[in-house]
Amino acid sequence: MWNEAVPLTAEDIEEYKKKTYLGYQPTPYELYIKVLIDTFGDQVEDDFSIQLPDGVKDLKYQKDAVIQGYQMLMQHNGLFLADVVGLGKTIIATMIAKRFVEANGKNTNILVVYPPALEDNWRNTFKLFGIYKKAQFITNGSLSKVLDGKDNYKDKEEFDLIIVDEAHGFRSDSSGKYDELQKICKSPCINMGLLKSSQKKVMLLSATPLNNRPDDLQNQLLLFQNSQSCTIDGVPNLKGLFSEHILDYKRLMRERDQRDVTSEVDKIYEQIRSKVIDKVTVRRTRNNILNDPDYRADIKSQGIIFPNILPPNELEYVMDSDTSNRFYETLKQLTDGKTDENPEGKGLTYARYRAVEFLKPEYRNKYKNAVHIGQTLAAIYRVHMVKRLESSFYAFKKSLRTLLRITTDMIKMFKEDKVIIAPDLKVKELQAKNMELDEIIEYAITKGYAAEDILFPADAFTSEFLEMLHHDREILEQLNADWEKENDDPKFDKFQENLTHNFFDKEINPSGKLVLFSESVDTLNYLYDRLTKEIGRSDVLMVTAANRNRLEQTIKENFDANFDSDSMRYNIIITSDVLAEGVNLHRSNVIVNYDSPWNATRLMQRIGRVNRIGSVAPNIYNYMFYPSQQGDKEIQLYKNALVKLQGFHSAFGEDAQIYSKEEIVKELQMFDNNVKDSIDKKIALLREVRELYNSDRKLYHKIKALPMKSRVMRDTGKHSGKSIIFVSSNVKTEFYLATTTGVEVIDFLEAVKYLKAKPEEQPVPFSNEEQHYKHVNSALAQYTTEYVEAADTSSINRTDLDKTSLEANKFLRTIKQITADSELKLQCDVLMGYINEGIYAQLPRYLKALSREYKNDRAKMKQDEYSLQNKISELLGEYQTMNKEQRHDAQDISNPQIIISESFK
């Protein structure tokens, strides 16, 4: 060996040093630009171009969204595409999909998931961009067809990219459709394309991904992230990060009746936004686009207008004293029922919906959580009745008559000693058709029901239940009689007044088009009759779920500004929320919300129908019929919606008032008056490094090629004794701030505040190298502790898991102990790995429920070993994901590197 050795000279050593961080001293500016290059990656040099189909505008902000989104897709296996309503999410998603197909190869398969109303939009857009044959399309309620192999759908493992439109519909991880989607998203890819990835990519589209709670965001993130092996910078444990925010949010929701909690809800969502959302979300508001000079010039040159959404206009109606008294007394009866919390209540109990709650114990056993089910149904119906009262007196009277009828029918069942409980059978509807009870029972048996499962004698219920039914009937008869005397409708009078003098004023409504939304179809029928028959308007179009598809062409001709036709056949469209998504109504710039939706994000979606690319009016007017003071007192509709909407604004940086004049849109100030929020700041930083790339390519490539561990010492007169360290692996990057007291993770924008430097600034000699190395090593040690060790599922701290996961794991370990079957033991190990990594939401819940059947009875488990083996095997088939080696390769963070470090004198 020594005979083959080559002698090294001092010159050789110096030459080798030049190739390492020891051989070249970068300037602070060069290190700053190096961080921008590494952070923005392909976004800087990306020369992405696509042949746009005829009729599709070439918009710079959309192309940049494609570049950013594709990079997130590659880095995190998924993203939120959450540009505000009307900025072209479908087009952007399709361009990302086309780019993915080009990168991954001809065998790429895409699954597009959407609400039924959006099917044509997706199919047509994919055809337009030439990737229709690469995709299969499915409505969001039909995902079981993929899992069951029906209707010629490919196996879930054959899809490489999943696109989910209106993804906020999958916010609840306890729903069946969420479980189905998660199984599809987390299953491995068997077609190893050119990208050589066995992990699916997932695009979640929604202008409103936050619906009500922090849980909603967490659940959607878990469609493409695992809780324990999260790829998002600064998040070692996704559920761990969210759990504190979820608890705080629940506490604030309990306290909101007593005090204003809006600012505290803001803080929760601001933290979620900065720690998580910004890193996996492509989201631009209209303000973000207008704040960027390149984007602003681009849309101006193409004649695109972004209308101003003006503050909501309140339409308050005044009731006379007789109507007001009737209204208030009715609310009292609707909401003041006797409950455990309100034992003195004398109002409606909604007993008709609480039958299972009052079964005697020996009959109630077949219903799990019977008391909870009954009380929940009663609460839902109470809210429903108050909402109907707020919507229109007509709708409320109709619901009042229905509730009286079904309550009377239940009393009739008691008299005949034949009480039927079968929710799926729709007994109330059959009774409404005058079917006798014996006929209903015979009908149920033909449908596969056993008589003993649905038919109960009167004495199967506690005596209290029949008393409650009689109590409710008495109140309902009085209310019905009282409301039959009410012939006034001050709300409609207010609407008609504005229809005559305001809504069609050319100063505010140049196109002469009006859009009205109501949650209640009964209210729409009432309005349509009065508008057409009483007022005599022939230009009113009513759209509901029943006729939406049939009227699609008519809607486009009369209300879509992008459509060739400018028909004036219909100038008023009154509709339910069936048109709140996936349709253009932007020939209009005036929206009337006849009632306020319980789901506050619907308000954003409604306004989004008229605030779209192609809008021609300079302003958008948003009229609201607010709940009366009495209604607000009882159900706090206004306050609930405000809290939820403000939470959404804080998390996503919305750009307009939606609900009330009190609502303040967050202008999230960063560094100067021209930059409004973190998205603006990142766009500005990307523009800065792109300008260097375009103006001085030689310097750009020199900086890009700086070696790992490049370092600099600065003397700026501030930050004395601090260091910034940038650590990265194949999966995750982190910025650390190190001081004499320790190290802490900071986000990219915070790091940039320290690193930003001008080209002329020069470095200073290292005055304390020992401290610098200590800072660097401390940062590397923290990264290793938080990510490298945590990524080893065998070393996961059991306290990181929730109680359900711990119980599921305990059950699986017990199965391993009672069986000698090596295959069953291996299957249990695989499932425990899934649970430890937080891959599936419903898997631990299912195992927990299964464990409750055995109550830790090992003898019974041993006796049922064959059955348990089948169930465990079925679970593995259902909850299938990449094997351990594939997951390790996809999430390998075992070799972290120091990219740069910077210390301050």
List where the protein language model places each region:
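ATP-dependent helicase/translocase motor core
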Residues: M1-V84, I91-A103, N107, S175-Q182, ...
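C-terminal accessory region of SF2 helicases/translocases
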Residues: W2, Y21-P28, F40, S615-K905
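Conserved Helicase C-terminal RecA-like lobe
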Residues: D47-Q51, G55, A97, I299-M319, ...
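Conserved Walker A/P-loop ATP-binding site and its immediately adjacent core
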Residues: T90-M95, K106-L128, N211-D215, E519-L524
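Conserved helicase motor
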Residues: A117, I138-L147, S174, S518-D522, ...
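Conserved helix-turn-beta segment of the N-terminal RecA-like "Helicase ATP-binding" lobe
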Residues: A117-Q136, F224-Q228, R530-S538
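Inter-lobe coupling linker of SF2 helicases/translocases
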Residues: F137-F170, S174-K200, L204-A207, D216, ...
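Conserved RecA-like P-loop NTPase helicase motor core
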Residues: R171, T208, T532, G536-E634
